[in-house]
Amino acid sequence: MSSRFSSAPYDAYAALSTADIKHPTITLSTGPAVALTYGQYRAILATNRNQSDRAAAFAAYHELFAANVNTYASLYNGVLQRDWFHAQSRGYRSTLEAALHGNNIPTTVVENLIESTKAGTEPLRRYHRLRKRVLGLDTYHNYDGAIPIVDLDRKYSL
């Protein structure tokens, strides 16, 4: 019975972020107006070489979530409260300990992973600087990460 209620935050999130979403329309620099579905959003980020088009798609798509930020925050709080309740009722010291127990992973593994990740971000930053330079961008943003560095349209035949 508990699991049925435990899925309520996820079910509400899924309905809000898919079925109830009103996709915005943006106008690209080439002229056409595009209904910004998730598929169109990903396609623009991955194929459109115009940074201002990618920026417009990014802003419009994320505004969908910003419009309901309090609802999303409340749903996430429900997930956190549910997980905390389950961890406490089963005798765990934390939700992390509860999540890792089934695979017999000590919490120190995740804590070390987090610290190692924080300490090892320089290669990723160097990669982003390289992408910025190769793409000829003045600034580099999250929405620039999916665009290919080179144009390659190779056809293969069998």
What do the PLM-derived regions correspond to, one by one?
Residues 19, 71, 78, 123, ...:
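Generic macromolecular interface patches on structured domains
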